């Protein structure tokens, strides 16, 4: 039996990719709590300049990731997903190490851009698992996989702040590089993929990829949904701490309260994502997606009228439980409506839309709050999500029957 015919243990691959997504999510969020402090340490002074450069070094990673993702997705479809996971983990490890050696803000900005160019571990992990799991378990598996990055993102800021306080800012970058290198080793030795490389001349062009889809308009609507999910999340991020401070009044532990309220949606998503993914496998991910979007709207509106941090925290916990279903449902529908031959590009296109949302969301939130106040941000975000719920309902209505009955290509 050839290596290409050897059965794949998809459960082992799911476990290892979950761990890889956890380490990647932790690595990225390790440096987030002190990013403005590191910018200041590199010589940027003055309130306006510090805000500008902090925003630039944060956003440029997502911007370059959006640009590079389709290229890496095409390469994954041609060369295999495992090699893309290895490239991403090792590349990000080297870049993180170099960040710890940066001597000025321009070097750091360039390295943040390079980090975006070399990233892509999580979308390639999704593509790998999507091509290996039994189709009737797609929702559960992708929901479970999504909790890896969420778990890492929750733990990262806590660990990063502790490490920075005790060993300094630069040391955290070196530790982050080590974490990513461990991710590389796990991927190298524990992930298995049977992939036959495809000649470049046999690869479909981007136009041919979309022409090959049974429902290209549906797939495009799923990309838009991913963008809006990130816009909705990112629009609240810049004003959350300030909004909590307004609600809490003069208290000494505002940072702790804000951190808790920022974290509770992720905790709720950890609990809900696998369960709602399994439910989606039974009743259809399109139903889960629409209901979760509507619930999100109904929870965002009262956030504009809360009077205490506790009220806001409860609503954000419930919002996180609903949000835990959104991206796994989108990813499952992408699996149902594409083939394994193009899954790398489909997931990379989706990642590009997410990255665009990550860039534009904070800009929208900051602009709305500057002109209309903190409370208006939640109403505007609710309006954006409501539009998405209506748009998704119309897009999913006609092809819902096909989307919930995946049988377009075989899996191991």
From Swiss-Prot:
Its transmembrane ranges are 19-39, 56-76, 90-110, 113-133, 144-164, 171-191, 222-242, 254-274, 288-308, 317-337, 376-396
Spell out the subcellular localization from the entry.
Cell inner membrane
Q: What is its main location?
A: membrane
Q: What keywords would UniProt list here?
A: Cell inner membrane, Cell membrane, Membrane, Transmembrane, Transmembrane helix, Transport
- A single GO molecular function, which one? transmembrane transporter activity
Q: Which Pfam families match?
A: MFS_1 (PF07690), Sugar_tr (PF00083)
Membrane topology term: Multi-pass membrane protein
Q: Which Gene3D superfamilies does this entry report, sorted A to Z?
A: MFS general substrate transporter like domains
InterPro entries given in the database record: MFS, MFS_dom, MFS_MdtG_subfamily, MFS_sugar_transport-like, MFS_trans_sf, Mutidrug-R_MdtG, Tet-R_TetA/multi-R_MdtG-like
Provide the Gene Ontology terms for cellular component.
Answer: plasma membrane
Which family does the record claim for this protein? Belongs to the major facilitator superfamily. DHA1 family. MdtG (TC 2.A.1.2.20) subfamily.
What is the protein's given name?
Multidrug resistance protein MdtG
Supply the source organism for this entry: Klebsiella pneumoniae (strain 342)
